[in-house]
Amino acid sequence: MDKVYEAALLLDFYGQLLTKRQFEILDLYLNNDYSLGEIAEHLNISRQGVYDNIKRGRAMLDRMEEKLGLVHKFLQQKNRALEILKDIKSIDISSMSVEDAKILKRVEERIEEIVES
């Protein structure tokens, strides 16, 4: 998995457990693609301060994931839903009743919504 995507997921899951400053800096860095210099200028702190906060915040996120495993569980569930969706799409609906085909289509759409959220 892409390191930036993984870090952004960790921030989504555990970000509110960080200090406000760490969350703000990591959010600007990961979700808004700010550079260290841009964050430093925006928050009136040194680049070293930004770097240290990113390092500490990321370490905290990693420790939380190691203990709780919520992102790992989320990704497993998403992959399972994708497998189910693939199986549903492979079903031949030509021999189904119109009503059964509509139900299957609704199930497919709901699973797609789950995967995309």
Swiss-Prot record:
State the superkingdom: Bacteria
Report the family membership: Belongs to the UPF0122 family.
Q: What does this protein do?
A: Might take part in the signal recognition particle (SRP) pathway. This is inferred from the conservation of its genetic proximity to ftsY/ffh. May be a regulatory protein.
Q: What is this protein called?
A: UPF0122 protein Cthe_0771
Annotated organism of origin: Acetivibrio thermocellus (strain ATCC 27405 / DSM 1237 / JCM 9322 / NBRC 103400 / NCIMB 10682 / NRRL B-4536 / VPI 7372) (Clostridium thermocellum)
